[in-house]
Structure formats: structure tokens, C-alpha cells
Amino acid sequence: MKKKIFIGSSSEELRIAEKVKKILEQDNEFEVTIWNDNSIWDNSVFKLNHNFLTDLLNSSLSSDFGILIGTCDDKVIVRGTERLQPRDNVLFELGFFIGKLGLDNCAFLIDKNIHILSDVQGITLARANMGDPDELKRAVNCIKEHFKHQPNSGINFFPSSTLASVYHENFIKPTCQTIIEDNGILDTAGKKHTNCLVKIIIPNKINIDVNSQFQILKNKISTNTLSFNYKGRPRNISIEIVESSEENTTIIDFPTIISGIYYAISNLLPQDSETDSITYRNILARELDRFVNTLYKFIKRDGYDEIVKIVYEDKLY
């Protein structure tokens, strides 16, 4: 899946935004959307029948990175001196996207002659003479390289990251600790299961009833229920297993916690949002992708990637 970049600018400078988009999409690594792009209205984030803030929220949930373009739109008096600064709405959008995507995933592309408020210093800044094609290309390429080097599954402020963290700490980590430290799993019936592999099953898409989704998948697999003492936890846990042989045991888990993604998004967006719309489904798909990427990061960080595999449902059979 291509990383998505949102470009915001004043309506007077859409011409520059289009040039920036063209540079960003040259190597086909990013999918770029310009706000209020009149030349490609169908691909625009903002629609006439939507509230501005609602659409801005939708775009932040649908994007991985944000670039705001600051040009010499307004004249202001700063301590008795006349200076040029970007429009207030551009600064608002910059703050909004930093709050949603994180500081490292946003950039401010500004004209050389612009006055920058001290409050925005410290974010990724790229200055250029907007009328010089070579300067503009160099500045945009600097931003592009910065985005390319951002961790693919970095922890962010989205609900999926929190859910992945909770799932890892409460299921994957203690299960793997038990397998590693005890050289397998000793169930409550006294049977030892060695050479264990944990498979985390991920649905291709999220529906409102995730439990039913997973039950349908579970019905297609012949499994047994096994209980064992959680490592470091004063309680038992029941898991589904598939024993391919006497020596090998595959542990199957369906992370129903991802139902929280659906409810989190439905609570973030206005109540009148169309849950069957392409935008809504795309947001859910990207959140599921973020859940998987974040979970994989935790698994690899703790050294469990040899015994834990993440499998999508269409690769299960």
C-alpha cells in the first residue's frame, strides 16, 4: 500500500501545490491528495456537501504524512515592522495535522521571504523561492527523503497503535515468554506442547461484528482448546491449537480487540458519516494496516518474530 500525503495550501496557491504533487509522485512511492484540487475534483478531500472540519478529520485519518505550503499571502505588522506570513487557515491545518500524525510526519514548505512564528520553529521546515523550479524541487525532495526515512510502523496517535500495544502485552508477550522459558507449553491436563508456532489471524477487512467474522473463520479450522498458566500471571488462558504432529503445535489466535478500531473511528467521526462510503472503508483499512504494522514492530522488538507469524485470512487455507 502506497503511503498517502496530504497537501494543504491557500486556494490562491493551488498552482504551487500541483507542482509539489508532481514532484512527490515521480517515483510512484506516494499517493498525494491536494485539498480543494479543482482540476481533479473527484480526488479532492473536500466536497461541497461536507463540513470543513469533518473533511479535515477524514483526511488526517486517511493520510500518513502532511505537507502544508506557506506562501506570502498576508501582510502583518510584527513589532512595528511589516512582514509577510501565510494564511491563518494554513497554520491551523499545520497544527491540526501535527496533532493527528505526529511532528515527524508533517512538514512546512515555505517561501523564502515568509515570516515564521517562533511557535512553529522545530518542525520540519523547507524554504524555497516558489517561483524557481529548481529550488522548489530541491526543497520538496528534502521533504520526500525525510518522509521515506520515517519508521514504517512507528507508534502514533491512532487507536490502532494503542490496541496493538494492549494485545501484544496481554497475549503475545506472556504466551511467548512461556514458550521460550518453559521450552513449550504445559497445559492444565499435564501435557507438554513443544515446538510451538503462534499464528495471528487478521481479517481482510473489518466489519462491525468482528466476533462473528472470526467465528466464521474458526469454523473452517479444526482446532482444540488448550489451557495453561500465563507466564507471570495468576490465571489460566485458553487458546486454540492445531497439532500438525506430536512434536509441533500451532497456536491460532483471532485478535477480536480490533473491533475497537471500528468503534473508535465511528466515535471520532460525526454521527452522520456514511459507514458504507469509500472514504470510511479506506479509513478502516488503513487503521487495520496500522494495527498489523505496529504489532509486527512490537513482535520484532521483543525477538518473537521466529515463533509468531501474522497471517491474513485469505492466506490461511
From Swiss-Prot:
- Broad EC category: hydrolase
InterPro entries reported in the protein's UniProt record: CAP12/PCTIR_TIR_dom, Prok_STING
EC number(s) from the headed UniProt entry: 3.2.2.5
Does Nucleotide-binding show up as a keyword for this record?
A: yes
Catalysed reactions listed for this entry: NAD(+) + H2O = ADP-D-ribose + nicotinamide + H(+)
- Give positions of region: STING domain: 160-316
Q: Where does 3',3'-c-di-GMP bind?
A: 171, 234, 253
One GO MF term, please?
Answer: NADP+ nucleosidase activity
Q: Which GO terms describe its biological process?
A: defense response to virus
Q: So which domain of life are we looking at? A: Bacteria
For this UniProt record, the keywords arranged alphabetically read as follows: Antiviral defense, Hydrolase, Nucleotide-binding
| Activity modulation | NAD(+) hydrolase activity is strongly stimulated by c-di-GMP, weakly by 3'3'-cGAMP, very weakly by c-di-AMP but not at all by 2'3'-cGAMP. Self-association of TIR domains is required for NADase activity.
Query: Which parts of the sequence belong to the TIR domain?
Result: 4-128
Free-text note regarding domains? The N-terminal TIR domain mediates NAD(+) hydrolase (NADase) activity. The cyclic nucleotide binds in the C-terminal bacterial STING region. Upon binding to c-di-GMP the STING region closes around the ligand, which is bound by residues from 2 adjacent subunits. STING-STING interactions are the main drivers of filamentation; rearrangements in the STING domain allow reorganization of packing of the TIR domains, forming the NADase active site; cross-filament contacts strengthen the assembly.
Q: How does it assemble?
A: Forms homodimers; in the presence of c-di-GMP forms filaments with an ordered array of parallel-stacked subunits.
Q: What does this protein do?
A: Effector protein of a CBASS antiviral system with NAD(+) hydrolase activity. CBASS (cyclic oligonucleotide-based antiphage signaling system) provides immunity against bacteriophage. The CD-NTase protein synthesizes cyclic nucleotides in response to infection; these serve as specific second messenger signals. The signals activate a diverse range of effectors, leading to bacterial cell death and thus abortive phage infection. A type I-D(GG) CBASS system. Binds 3'3'-c-di-GMP and 3'-3'-cGAMP, but not c-di-AMP, 2'-3'-cGAMP or cUMP-AMP. Upon activation by c-di-GMP forms filaments which hydrolyze NAD(+); filament formation is required for enzyme activation.
Family as reported in the entry's similarity comment: In the C-terminal section; belongs to the bacterial STING family.
Could you identify this protein by its name?
CD-NTase-associated protein 12
